[in-house]
């Protein structure tokens, strides 16, 4: 009730203020009129000057008076919007026809929502900065200054260390043989032979796995000039499918702080393909679905599923 | 093999499964090692001498399985499909191929496997009292540049196709059995990674049976994928699904080779031959019994 009353008082003040502004404007325009008209209609130059100055002084006085009046009124009007957290948009709450234009409630909701969003985005960015998921240095463009710092831990490891990690993994799995070569500079390429089931070409950059290609045990993995063929895919549909899944696994096993663990997890997962043709699907119990054996291996349990049988 | 030549073969490779040449051997070394009498050695010098003008090259590549064989193929099962009741061979084949096409298999040309039987000539049997062995010389359209020579339960030789010419040269020691040629011809079907070949087995002019060959290309160890293969066979052979071929059991986790397929074909052909013999014997018996019946009608 008090609110409404004060608004009423203010409204009166507003009306007076508006008329004061009008008065101010007309007195100001009179000043300029007088300046525009200049000196005239007097016989002597002295008389003309005197009349003009007096007229000009009158006009300025009235401007001054009107301005003072406006200042006085503006104090009366006060600043009603200042109390409101939404500032001027808070005035929308004064709209009496809420049902037709529910602008104010919508505005409040949008405001809350954007507040929350900002809060959560802040939290997320804090967490993401701790655990950088970026696989390549080129993408770390956000803070170019920090890039050289991030590299030594993950991307620039001595080849000797990579060799050690790989040979340790090689010894861990007896049915898996890993042949490491470095045909192009420091990046290692692995030829993994898994039992008599399949061969995998793994292209590494430091200890990051960049690319894998799965081929059959009896397929040729070398190009004509005796290099590892890292581009052509397998002739068999089953190994093309396994290649796709292996690429998925590369993206799944990510732990930038401990790249050797990533390689080991990937190899452990890969090893479950030793039973590619022997394990029936854990869901439908069959070997074949559309002519393909269960090509998917669960990332945690390593159980065999058909591509369409997994969750 | 003593006579291993150093030069690699320059024969161009075939369409699929071209058998690569790991090393080159004289074909006769195989024969000598498989128990030929010493008198053969005289012939040895004749065959390899440049006077033999029928070969474009005097080199002859040959490998003895399984130790020195580098090539592999997908695990394959060859089986016989019985002719459906009241149907001809041709109709049963059509029934089978229609079933395959319904499954989604795509036609991919034709195939042919043939087999000729040789027996060792009496003159070459040594004094040790060796029994005459049967040797089978086979060809497979899947390996157009190769020729397979097999002994029953014995070694399998994979050689160039001009091995046939050598067999002509060796006719004093191996004689071709009369009218022994048996072959199977039919259509190849591809379904995913499976290769299915349904063929009509013919001896001379008449059809004698149906052969079904299923190859699973990605897998090279027979024991690994037998269950998987069985499931596929059941999907279109139904109750006629065969048991595991004998060659699967022989070599536990060895890599499957084209020669294993040829051994299966040899066994299939022998089985069909025996079935025919029993059939003929049965007919002979019928004829003689009907004759005796006729005789009995007459008073003696």
UniProtKB/Swiss-Prot annotation, chain A:
The modification Phosphoserine is found at residue 132. InterPro entries: Mediator_Med27. The keyword Nucleus applies. The modification N6-methyllysine is found at residue 134. Its main location: nucleus. It is found in: Nucleus. Keywords: Activator, Methylation, Nucleus, Phosphoprotein, Transcription, Transcription regulation. Component of the Mediator complex, which is composed of MED1, MED4, MED6, MED7, MED8, MED9, MED10, MED11, MED12, MED13, MED13L, MED14, MED15, MED16, MED17, MED18, MED19, MED20, MED21, MED22, MED23, MED24, MED25, MED26, MED27, MED29, MED30, MED31, CCNC, CDK8 and CDC2L6/CDK11. The MED12, MED13, CCNC and CDK8 subunits form a distinct module termed the CDK8 module. Mediator containing the CDK8 module is less active than Mediator lacking this module in supporting transcriptional activation. Component of the Mediator complex, a coactivator involved in the regulated transcription of nearly all RNA polymerase II-dependent genes. Mediator functions as a bridge to convey information from gene-specific regulatory proteins to the basal RNA polymerase II transcription machinery. Mediator is recruited to promoters by direct interactions with regulatory proteins and serves as a scaffold for the assembly of a functional preinitiation complex with RNA polymerase II and the general transcription factors. Coiled coil: none annotated. This is Mediator of RNA polymerase II transcription subunit 27. Pfam families: Med27. GO terms for molecular function: transcription coactivator activity. It comes from Bos taurus (Bovine). GO terms for cellular component: core mediator complex; cytosol; mediator complex; nucleolus; nucleoplasm. GO terms for biological process: regulation of transcription by RNA polymerase II; somatic stem cell population maintenance. Belongs to the Mediator complex subunit 27 family. It comes from the Eukaryota.
């Amino acid at each position: 009730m008090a609110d409404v009353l004060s608004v009423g008082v203010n409204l009166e003040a507003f009306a007076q203020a508006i008329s004061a502004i009008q008065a101010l404007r007309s007195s100001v325009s009179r000043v300029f009129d007088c300046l525009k008209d200049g000196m005239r209609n007097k016989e002597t130059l002295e008389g003309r000057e005197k009349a003009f100055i007096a007229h000009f002084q009158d006009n300025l006085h009235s401007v001054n008076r009107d301005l003072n009046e406006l200042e006085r009124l503006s104090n009366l009007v006060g600043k009603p919007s200042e109390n409101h957290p939404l500032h001027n948009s808070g005035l929308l709450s004064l709209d009496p026809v809420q049902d037709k234009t529910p602008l104010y409630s919508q505005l409040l909701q949008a405001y809350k929502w954007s507040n929350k969003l900002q809060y959560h985005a802040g939290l997320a960015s804090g967490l993401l900065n701790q655990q950088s998921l970026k696989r390549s240095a080129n993408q770390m463009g956000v803070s170019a200054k920090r890039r050289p710092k991030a590299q030594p831990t993950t991307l620039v490891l001595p080849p000797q260390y990579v060799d050690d990690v790989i040979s340790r993994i090689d010894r861990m799995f007896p049915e898996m043989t890993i042949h490491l070569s470095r045909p192009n500079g420091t990046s290692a390429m692995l030829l993994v032979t898994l039992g008599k089931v399949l061969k995998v070409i793994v292209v590494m950059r430091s200890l990051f796995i960049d690319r894998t290609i799965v081929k059959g045990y009896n397929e040729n993995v070398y190009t004509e000039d005796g290099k590892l063929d890292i581009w052509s895919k397998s002739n068999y549909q089953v190994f093309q499918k396994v290649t796709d899944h292996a690429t998925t696994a590369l993206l799944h096993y990510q732990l930038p702080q401990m790249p050797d663990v990533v390689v080991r997890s990937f190899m452990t997962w890969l090893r479950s393909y030793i039973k590619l043709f022997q394990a029936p699907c854990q869901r439908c119990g069959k070997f074949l679905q559309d002519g393909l054996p269960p090509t998917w291996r669960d990332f945690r349990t390593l159980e065999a599923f058909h591509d369409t049988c997994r969750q | 093999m003593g006579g291993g030549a150093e030069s690699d073969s320059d024969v161009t490779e075939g369409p699929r499964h071209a058998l690569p040449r790991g090393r080159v051997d004289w074909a006769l070394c195989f024969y000598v090692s498989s128990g030929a009498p010493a008198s053969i050695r005289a012939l040895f010098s004749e065959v390899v001498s440049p006077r033999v003008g029928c070969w474009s090259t005097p080199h002859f590549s040959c490998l003895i399985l399984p130790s020195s064989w580098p090539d592999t193929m997908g695990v394959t099962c060859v089986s016989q499909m019985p002719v459906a009741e009241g149907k001809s061979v041709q109709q049963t084949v059509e029934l089978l191929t229609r079933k395959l096409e319904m499954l989604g298999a795509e036609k991919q040309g034709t195939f042919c496997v043939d087999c000729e039987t040789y027996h060792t000539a009496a003159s070459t049997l040594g004094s040790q009292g060796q029994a005459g062995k049967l040797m089978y010389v086979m060809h497979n359209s899947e390996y157009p540049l190769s020729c397979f020579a097999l002994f029953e339960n014995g070694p399998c030789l994979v050689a160039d196709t001009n091995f046939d010419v050598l067999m002509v040269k060796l006719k004093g020691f191996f004689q071709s059995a009369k009218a022994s040629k048996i072959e199977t011809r039919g259509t190849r079907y591809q379904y995913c990674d499976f290769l299915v070949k349904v063929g009509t087995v013919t001896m001379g002019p008449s059809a004698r049976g149906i052969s079904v060959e299923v190859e699973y290309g990605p897998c090279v160890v027979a024991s690994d994928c037998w269950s998987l293969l069985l499931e596929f066979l059941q999907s279109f052979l139904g109750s006629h699904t065969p048991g595991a071929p004998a060659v699967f059991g022989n070599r536990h986790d060895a890599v499957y080779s084209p020669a294993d397929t040829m051994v299966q074909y040899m066994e299939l052909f022998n089985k069909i031959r025996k079935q025919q013999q029993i059939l003929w014997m049965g007919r002979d018996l019928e004829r003689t019994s009907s004759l005796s019946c006729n005789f009995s009608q007459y008073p003696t």
